[in-house]
UniProtKB/Swiss-Prot annotation:
Comment text on domains: Contains 2 SPKK motifs which may interact with the minor groove of A/T-rich DNA sites. Phosphorylation of this motif may regulate DNA binding. This motif is reiterated in both termini of histone H1 and in the N-terminus of sea urchin histones H2B, but its presence in the C-terminus seems to be unique to plant H2A.
Motif SPKK motif 1: chain residues: 148-151
Protein name, entry field: Probable histone H2A.4
Chief subcellular location: nucleus
Function as written in the Swiss-Prot or TrEMBL entry: Core component of nucleosome. Nucleosomes wrap and compact DNA into chromatin, limiting DNA accessibility to the cellular machineries which require DNA as a template. Histones thereby play a central role in transcription regulation, DNA repair, DNA replication and chromosomal stability. DNA accessibility is regulated via a complex set of post-translational modifications of histones, also called histone code, and nucleosome remodeling.
MF GO annotations: DNA binding; protein heterodimerization activity; structural constituent of chromatin
Annotated stretches, region: Disordered: 1-30, 134-163
Basic residues composition bias: residue spans: 147-163
Chain span(s) of sequence motif SPKK motif 2: 156-159
Length: 163
């Protein structure tokens, strides 16, 4: 070919050099980030929510990763709670037990009410039945002291003066 002669372009090929090869299959941003949560949908919600005039490209990816991590953490703990109760299916009760028994999740979701979750079991130790001699000896051997309210352990002023 001569110098300066035009090279015919391939149909549909873009770019400076005319591109080459077949068109590649599009890859979603969720797949690129290695996430299960939808990055594109979260980005769309951020834009439609009018949280800001402009949304950076990394913001929906980061938010999707955080949401996926939190969901995985709650589901893992709820699955453990279901297994502890000898159940195969996670119900709202298991989710509540998982969240309230975890210190950090409990702090994060302190003001959240979970429908059909119930409450954490909490029985005052004074109301529990008395321990048998062998159980009390075993507990004393391990160095544990039974928890009881301060009122039950403090003496009355008359008894304190007599002693």
């Amino acid at each position: 070919m001569e110098v300066g002669a035009k090279v015919p372009k391939k149909a549909g090929a873009g770019g400076r050099r005319g591109g080459g090869g077949p068109k590649k299959k599009p890859v979603s941003r969720s797949v690129k980030a290695g996430l299960q949560f939808p990055v594109g949908r979260i980005g769309r919600y951020l834009k439609q929510g009018r949280y800001s005039q402009r949304i950076g490209t990394g913001a929906p990816v980061y938010l999707a990763a955080v949401l996926e991590y939190l969901a995985a953490e709650v589901l893992e703990l709820a699955g453990n709670a279901a297994r502890d109760n000898k159940k195969n299916r996670i119900i709202p009760r298991h989710v509540l037990l998982a969240i309230r028994n975890d210190e950090e999740l409990g702090k994060l979701l302190a003001g959240v009410t979970i429908a059909h979750g119930g409450v954490l079991p909490n029985i005052n130790p004074v109301l529990l039945p008395k321990k048998t001699g062998s159980a009390a000896a075993k507990e004393a051997k391990e160095g544990k002291t039974p928890k009881s309210p301060k009122k039950a352990t403090t003496k009355s002023p008359k008894k304190a003066a007599a002693a």
